Each structure stands twice: as C-alpha cells, then as structure tokens.
C-alpha cells in the first residue's frame, strides 16, 4: 500500500522552478568545500513529529487523520507507520531517520510486552532499511510521556522507575546498535524539578550520573561505536531541567568524569528557550569539545514554549554552519528535523512542503557559510585580534612562565599602558551579510 502515491519523488529542479514539490537549492550531489551537500548535511527525518504526533495541543484533540493512526491491531499499525515512514524518506531522498523506542513500537501493558513488541519492530525496521538504503542517525528511549515518569526517569524518587527506564534504554541502545545507528541520544525531558520544596538536588544529580555511567558501560560492553549524546533543554515539561544548556551539560559531565564519553545534540528551539542563540550553543559546544549533532528547527521568540517549527532563516543557519564547517563538519552527527507541521496543516503534502522548504534553507545556509570559510575574512580578523597572545610575552603567560606576583612586577617595571582596540563588530556583521546576500 502506498500512503503518498499522488506525490512524486522530490528532485532538484533549481532556483527558477516554481514546483512546490521540488528542491530549488538542495542539489545533493553539488560539491562544496570538497564534499557533496548530502555528505555535509547528513539530513534525517524524525519519526515522532512526522508520523506519531496526531495534531493535538493542550486545548484540542488530534486534527490529523493519518491511516496508520486509526484504531486497530497495535503491531499492525506500527508496521503501517513504518511503511509510510520509509516511503516518505525515500520520496524525500533523505539518507537518515531518527526515532524513540515507543514511536516505532506499541508499549503494551507490561515491560515484557514492551520488549517483545520493540524486538519485532526492530526486525521490521531492519528490513525496511535494507530495502530502502535509509540509515539510522540515532535512536533514543521515550522516558517522559508515560505517567510513571511524571517525577523523572533516572531522577525519580522510586528506584523501580529507574529500573524501568534502564530497561528501555538498554533495549533502545541495543536496537540502535543492531540497526547501524551512528549515535544514541539521551534527552532528560523530566530529569529536573517542578518545585524545590520536594526535591533533593544532590541526590537527583547523583542518580542521573549513575544512570549515564551505566549507559556508557553498556555501550562499551556491546561494542557500540557511535556517540552518546545528551540533548540540552532548560525547561518544559519540567520547570527546570538539569541539562539546561551546553555549558551546564559540560559542567555536569566534568563533575562526574563523563566528559570523554558523552557529547551534545543541540536543538535550535532549546537554545531559544535557554536565552541563547543557536550560534552560541554550537560555538560553545565546539569550544568545550562536546559537539555531536543538531536538531534542526526553530522556535518563536514571542512564545515561551517549544514550537518545533521548520527552520526558515538562512541568516541564523549560516552562522551555525559557519561554526560547524570551520571545525571540520559533522562526524557521526547530522541535521535531524525535530520539526512538525502546524496543526492546521492536515494534508499529506504539508509534510513534504515543510521538509522540502527546510532542506532548501539548509542548503542555502551551508553554501553561504562556505563562502565565509573560504574567504577567511572573519577568521583573519579574529586571529588579528588575539595576535599578541601568540607573541613571546603572551605565550609565556599561558605556559605558566609567570606567577601572579612576577607578572605584576613585570608590568610595573615596563610601565605597561595598554590601549583599547576596536572590536569592529559592524565590519564583521557586514562581512556576514555580504556572504549571505551574495554582495561579495
């Protein structure tokens, strides 16, 4: 059965085409900085927003009428959902997908049901991957939707909930390994608190760290070679989450000795909620040595919640890609569309429109970022700004050649009187705009 039979495979037709079901800027075979756009972007479609979300919100029931979401045998519906998903991936021409365990398999009424259903669906997903050539960018476990996780999973006050969560992650990591996944993501949606009045912060942090240590141990035991990634988010659904932003996650990992085992998966909308730019979070991840992968979407700065809209800003993404490209690009990570159509976008075509437009935006932004990397104007000015630290005096300070006292004595003896130099922010912003809009 075809779920999108009236929609053709999406092809590159160029910027002059007015076909809404064609790529206008994303030519997967176009080479930029020595790689094709497909190799640079490593695009993935997420299962949850695209095939699981029924179009509901807190004020209304599901607005969609997807065939695979209708009542019926749960496992059969899961197989239909997988068929629809892989038809979608294939027609879109995207090389990767992502999932939560309970996106792809019914949870059932017990932990045994969960394990059995998930095992059957992992077999089926493997068949679909083999037939289509689509690969798994990353898997994860849903440890936030069921009421048992209302007080968290790893940070729950009940150790049986911790054990249930550990079982899910064990199976999901095993499945990711078996399906050839390149990463495994840990998003602590309810690893936080709603009130400090009933929360033991130290205990919950210790529990979370113990859980992560067990995941790391299992990864090595089964021989999984992919990356483990934490996805930072400041709040929602909890008031405050322990993986608030990139810097917070890094500090947590260092505190518990996990900084060499776990990296970050950065979502644009989560950066917005944390009061940061997407650019900031990506740059910070590289500075701290924990960059892993990206969830591509956007939030609404006028809303205080996670809107998960498709990315549409070439300007914002150009700076994000600039950081990624100048640090060598993705390794195991990629650009996963953690984005959903709007509740009123009920037609099957809308799923394609959202992804096609966003993929074109990624392609445009990456090419504009490549201009910034190639012309080296930003980096040249940055190097010039810090050039004195590469001189003998600067190197001596950083290498430990001075104590605080001896440096003070040296400064007094030389009568240092440094002068402020321009930061040239306006010039730098002009350079970015010239690259984005093709002015130079």
UniProtKB/Swiss-Prot annotation:
Question: What's the record's note on cofactor binding?
Answer: Binds 2 magnesium ions per subunit.
* InterPro entries the record matches: Xyl_isomerase-like_sf, Xylose_isom_bac, Xylose_isomerase
Q: Which organism is it from?
A: Burkholderia cenocepacia (strain HI2424)
Would you tell me the protein name for this molecule? Xylose isomerase
Which gene specifies this protein's sequence? xylA
User: Active site at which residues?
Assistant: 100, 103
Quaternary arrangement and interactors, per the entry? Answer: Homotetramer.
User: In terms of one coarse class, where is the protein primarily found?
Assistant: cytoplasm
Instruction: Supply the source organism's classification.
Output: Bacteria, Pseudomonadati, Pseudomonadota, Betaproteobacteria, Burkholderiales
Q: Where in the cell is it found?
A: Cytoplasm
Where is Mg(2+) 1 bound in this sequence? 231, 267, 295, 338
């Amino acid at each position: 059965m075809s779920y999108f039979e009236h929609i053709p495979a999406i092809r590159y037709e160029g910027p002059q085409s007015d076909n809404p079901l064609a790529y206008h800027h994303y030519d997967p075979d176009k080479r930029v900085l020595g790689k094709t756009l497909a190799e640079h972007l490593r695009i993935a479609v997420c299962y949850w927003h695209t095939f699981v979300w029924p179009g509901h919100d807190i004020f209304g029931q599901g607005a969609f009428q997807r065939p695979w979401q209708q009542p019926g045998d749960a496992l059969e519906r899961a197989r239909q959902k997988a068929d629809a998903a892989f038809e979608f991936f294939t027609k879109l021409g995207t090389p990767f997908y992502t999932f939560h365990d309970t996106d792809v398999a019914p949870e059932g009424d017990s932990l045994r049901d969960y394990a059995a259903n998930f095992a059957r669906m992992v077999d089926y997903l493997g068949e679909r991957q083999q037939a289509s050539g689509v690969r798994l960018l990353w898997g994860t476990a849903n440890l936030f939707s069921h009421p048992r996780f209302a007080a968290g999973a790893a940070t729950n006050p009940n150790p049986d909930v911790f054990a249930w969560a550990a079982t899910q992650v064990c199976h999901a990591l095993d499945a990711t390994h078996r399906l050839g996944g390149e990463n495994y993501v840990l998003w602590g949606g309810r690893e936080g608190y709603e009130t400090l009045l009933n929360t033991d912060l130290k205990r919950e942090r210790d529990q979370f760290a113990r859980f992560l240590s067990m995941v790391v141990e299992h990864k090595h035991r089964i021989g999984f070679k992919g990356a483990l990634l934490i996805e930072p988010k400041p709040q929602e659904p909890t008031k405050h989450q322990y993986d608030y932003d990139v810097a917070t996650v890094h500090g947590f990992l260092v505190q518990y000795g996990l900084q060499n085992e776990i990296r970050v998966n950065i979502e644009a909308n989560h950066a917005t909620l944390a009061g940061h730019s997407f650019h900031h979070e990506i740059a910070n991840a590289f500075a701290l040595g924990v960059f892993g992968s990206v969830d591509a979407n956007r939030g609404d700065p006028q809303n205080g919640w996670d809107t998960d809209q498709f990315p549409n800003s070439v300007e914002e993404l150009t700076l994000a890609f600039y950081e990624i490209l100048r640090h060598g690009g993705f390794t195991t990570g990629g650009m996963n569309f953690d984005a959903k159509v709007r509740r009123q976008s009920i037609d099957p075509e809308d799923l394609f429109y959202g992804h096609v437009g966003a993929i074109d935006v990624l392609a445009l932004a990456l090419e504009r970022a490549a201009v910034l990397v190639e012309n080296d104007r930003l980096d040249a000015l940055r190097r010039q700004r810090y050039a004195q630290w590469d001189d003998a005096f600067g190197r001596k300070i950083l290498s430990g050649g001075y104590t605080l006292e001896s440096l003070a004595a040296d400064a007094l003896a030389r009568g240092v009187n440094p002068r402020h130099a321009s930061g040239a922010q306006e010039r730098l912003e002009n350079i970015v705009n010239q690259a984005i809009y093709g002015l130079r």
